[in-house]
From Swiss-Prot:
Name of the coding gene: cwlA
Organism annotation: Bacillus subtilis (strain 168)
BP terms from Gene Ontology: cell wall organization; establishment of competence for transformation; peptidoglycan catabolic process; peptidoglycan turnover; sporulation resulting in formation of a cellular spore
Reaction(s) this enzyme catalyzes, per UniProt: Hydrolyzes the link between N-acetylmuramoyl residues and L-amino acid residues in certain cell-wall glycopeptides
Keyword Cell wall biogenesis/degradation: yes
Domain of life: Bacteria
Claim: NAD is one of the keywords in the record: no
Lineage: Bacteria, Bacillati, Bacillota, Bacilli, Bacillales
SUPFAM superfamilies the UniProt entry points to: N-acetylmuramoyl-L-alanine amidase-like, PGBD-like
Pfam annotation, one family: Amidase_2
Protein name, entry field: N-acetylmuramoyl-L-alanine amidase CwlA
Entry's EC annotation: 3.5.1.28
Function: Autolysins are involved in some important biological processes such as cell separation, cell-wall turnover, competence for genetic transformation, formation of the flagella and sporulation.
Residues annotated as domain N-acetylmuramoyl-L-alanine amidase: 24-142
Protein family (similarity comment): Belongs to the N-acetylmuramoyl-L-alanine amidase 2 family.
Amino acid sequence: MAIKVVKNLVSKSKYGLKCPNPMKAEYITIHNTANDASAANEISYMKNNSSSTSFHFAVDDKQVIQGIPTNRNAWHTGDGTNGTGNRKSIGVEICYSKSGGVRYKAAEKLAIKFVAQLLKERGWGIDRVRKHQDWNGKYCPHRILSEGRWIQVKTAIEAELKKLGGKTNSSKASVAKKKTTNTSSKKTSYALPSGIFKVKSPMMRGEKVTQIQKALAALYFYPDKGAKNNGIDGVYGPKTADAIRRFQSMYGLTQDGIYGPKTKAKLEALLK
């Protein structure tokens, strides 16, 4: 049985502030609200305040409420005016994450089912699901991350998607390929070094580090989004380690911020 979505959409008079751009979504981004408000209160507050911050859905223990049309962008991932998270992803807020407990667990359970439903409706696989942290490094969804359950949550979404008869993966690297055609002619041109790269003193520097950074940026895991050259500076510092850590988290690798054989292999597979 499909999950009913209650619509309480932002007024068109506020589109310029909350959702100014038409959008053809390519991802779903999961958030935790970091407060204990209900879905109704989350949407009401989002709609009526003067901040540009916005999101498409809020999910609590009882219902899913929509505040922004899915064919409009929302400002929910902090990766800038033209960032992929803000411009190409559907934002889903899971309520009651501040205190956790029974209500939060029920909200998360409903959100898992709802995200699977969104995937099924669009013919997408689990590879289209992101966490807020993947876009700009923010520690969100905070409760899921602090409890070390991101992979568990993704696995649960995938299981629900299978129950709905959906496919668990989109066409191989289709999104990553599509999104980088304007910035790089061929991903196969990205040579990746062998060996271990990590933060140490003195910091590791040079062309091999630049190669790693360019590969991460090609997949939208920027060392420093918005900085000069998106942080591609040939220095393996904390920001590059964080980009590696976000990449590892997304693809089920050990989240240590260290570039090694397994991280290299996954990067190469996605860049083919």
